[in-house]
């Protein structure tokens, strides 16, 4: 994940900025599931993004919640939006069954360090994807 984020920050993002004349003060990065985890972890790699959002971020990966609780993000001034469901992980018999508790830990940590806007809804991981994305995009419009 670190290599991906470094490539995004050092190669892909500069190329996009050059090609499309993007306003570097209003860049947002977000994703769903593993993409949400990647967007969240970008907070420790770069301060290029003014807003970061994660929908059902895969915070259950080993060591992720611990890292987020123990380290202050490089981009602590970013606007952050996290949304997870209380039924994420239902039906699994591995560490995924605790997805909700990992999400709670990450939400609490990023509220403390970044003032993150957090939403814990009543749904599972794959439920209401369009609704969740629309809520996140409305949030991005408000904060940027």
Which stretches of residues belong to each language-model region?
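Non-catalytic cap/lid and distal C-terminal segments of serine-dependent acyl enzymes
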Residues: 1-144
């Amino acid at each position: 994940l670190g290599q991906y984020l470094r490539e995004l920050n050092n190669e892909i993002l500069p190329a996009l900025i050059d090609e499309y004349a993007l306003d570097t003060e209003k860049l947002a990065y977000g994703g769903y599931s593993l993409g949400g985890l990647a967007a969240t972890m970008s907070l420790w790699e770069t301060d290029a993004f003014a807003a970061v959002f994660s929908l059902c971020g895969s915070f259950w990966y080993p060591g992720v919640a611990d890292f987020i609780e123990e380290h202050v993000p490089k981009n602590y001034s970013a606007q952050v939006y996290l949304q997870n469901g209380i039924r994420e992980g239902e039906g699994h018999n591995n560490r995924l069954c605790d997805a909700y508790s990992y999400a709670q830990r990450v939400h609490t940590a990023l509220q403390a360090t970044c003032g993150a806007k957090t939403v814990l809804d009543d749904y599972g991981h794959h439920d209401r994807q369009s609704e969740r994305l629309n809520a996140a995009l409305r949030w991005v419009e408000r904060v940027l």
